[in-house]
Amino acid sequence: RGLKGGGCIRRNGKLEQVPLAWKTRKIPFAHAERTGVTIPWGDVYTANISTGIPNIEVYMCVPPSTVAQLRRIRGLGPLLGFAPVQALLKSQVGRKVRGPSEEKRKDAETWVWGEATDAAGRQVSAILKTPNGYTLTVLAALGIVAKLMAAQRPIGGFYTPSRLMGADYVLR
């Protein structure tokens, strides 16, 4: 569904649509340098709510060949929005895409990199090693549910995970 819309970044506090695979950069992990490509994840929206940072780009590390494939299909965006094409693509994903097995997830890890630059041009970056993305998502969701269930009074409204659980929640 997202292929038809291209990419999304936040610039000067506003969400801005950009082409699919709009920008790439090298991500300097401790174990290797990887190619990152911009992706329209929800973090483009939520990170601004949590931090107030006005300019946000989210990257995913992929092989350079994947970046090239994504850029080749940019012109197909309008076609990808048609219901029959959507149905075909969804059926292909359902048949061909499988997540990792429990055995593979057990020992897998995810590396998260972040970088921030202030108005004076000073930069800071950090790298965090977590369990694989599937496991991390489940553990985080269960922790949030436990907090909500234990609350003495209802916690209403909209929260990002870090606004509800604290900025260091991912470290617990």
Residue ranges of each PLM-predicted region?
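C-terminal catalytic/substrate-binding lobe primarily of soluble NAD(P)-dependent oxidoreductases
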Residues: 1-172
